């Protein structure tokens, strides 16, 4: 069977830059699934994405589906005919579904009986006939949150569509996709190259688009070019470009023909905190800031034009003129804000609502101040500095700078606090209170910052759960999942001696009578333990290991982490599987028994050598392991408990637990309960698979 290259290109208006990659990847994944479901043999499916196009190129696509033999078994002969030999309704319905009559059906005889059978040779459908619907289906499944409709058409897509190119080899596949008749026409760059041209063969793509249309259709190629050219441009001025992955992706999604240029701004603006300048350059203008080797911001920036100009200096000057007013605004806000102390913004917090039922930002500040001080006392941080940081924590939200450049919250609080002469750990805490902001983000660097970050997040968790507005599905408007995971990461990775039970109770207490959910403490703890589950799954721990620890519901995060590591190590031991099975057996035996067990094992009642040996080892280990449990040495404890494998196996091989003798039965059940209690001091090992 011959093979050809297939090309589909959807030419559009400018696509959303932050969604461009996901649209292209989804298009490729959807179309690959369509090919596979149709049984069409194919080679690599390559995706292309530029601001005004999505495209796929499929190598070695078969020209038709393979022929196939199908068999459909019908009713058993006994049910297919009545006593007079006439076909039953079931047989006739089955035959009708196969497109035959009952008398045309074959019979299948096996050692289990005889059935009606339909066999057919189905010729594979041509690829040309299948492709239009496959493309349309793949586009319809794209993850588009908001669809557009344009003109008088009822067609919906992410942006208006102008061209649809469908080529199988050198042949146009006739189809109407998104209201556009397919053709071999491709549009080039808006201002360079040929605005429109035809493509003769799918194999010519994307080279023909580069040569005639001045468009680099390969997303990764554009991104790599921007990165390499920006690094070289920064090197030429003795600096290093801030090429964050997210901004690189966005810029690569904004240009079809990237041309990297270098510009500058007035050095006087460097007196403004670098974070505000960088926010303006990266967030508003999509520029790449440049840093000196010592990490200080240089008065330069790198940007990407979408055109090759005969006079690039004109483009550079234009961008310098655009950014200057924004930097001047930042300078003005910075100087204006410093005319009063950060603390002077406290009264204005009373005018901003945190949440209708939970009060204002000033109310939240008072709670954070108290909770940060309480946490500081628990973890050995400076209580006075923690309460001071709590008092000032939201003051920068009232400054001109943060009002205009919202992403500078926290960091501007730090700069203004330093200007006011606040303690350094207080100033740093104001910046780090929102950390970690995302997975893998840095944690607060000092104890005061840890106390403030935990207090801020716990106040939000307690308040929102306290009024019954916990996250539902994908909706999490107060970012409670991120807050919960942030608290857990700080406590675990900083090894802080905090208990979620008392921490949540204190956060709830500070709300007074504002909360309406009587189960708020348990709800918050359950939610946070659920975040533990997600965290450890991401870390590669097995679900049953997590469940084994969760079964004990440990509320000290650092303790939870120690148990996780202990159980994970226990699973590597030779005795693990046998002891997990034994624990499961013990758990089942105890669950089925309604006996009232004794507080201790009666040694004089023991009879069999195997139960005597096991009972003695349980007693010895109970005393030996008590310090291990107290000190959180769970891994050492489980290693010691692994030594019970042999006596436990011997016990179950030789000893009957549920004997008629009640005293003996209760004594053996008591011994098993004491055995299980030792393991439960760490985790429920019976849940391990």
Swiss-Prot record:
Its main location: cytoplasm. PROSITE patterns: AA_TRNA_LIGASE_II_GLYAB. It is an enzyme of class 6 (ligase). GO terms for molecular function: arginine-tRNA ligase activity; ATP binding; glycine-tRNA ligase activity; tRNA binding. Signal peptide: none annotated. It comes from the Bacteria. It is found in: Cytoplasm. Keywords: Aminoacyl-tRNA synthetase, ATP-binding, Cytoplasm, Ligase, Nucleotide-binding, Protein biosynthesis. Disulfide bonds: none annotated. One of its GO terms (biological process) is glycyl-tRNA aminoacylation. Its EC number is 6.1.1.14. One of its GO terms (cellular component) is glycine-tRNA ligase complex. It catalyses: tRNA(Gly) + glycine + ATP = glycyl-tRNA(Gly) + AMP + diphosphate. Pfam families: DALR_1, tRNA_synt_2f. Tetramer of two alpha and two beta subunits. Belongs to the class-II aminoacyl-tRNA synthetase family. HAMAP family: Gly_tRNA_synth_beta (MF_00255). NCBIfam families: glyS. This is Glycine--tRNA ligase beta subunit. It comes from Escherichia coli (strain K12).
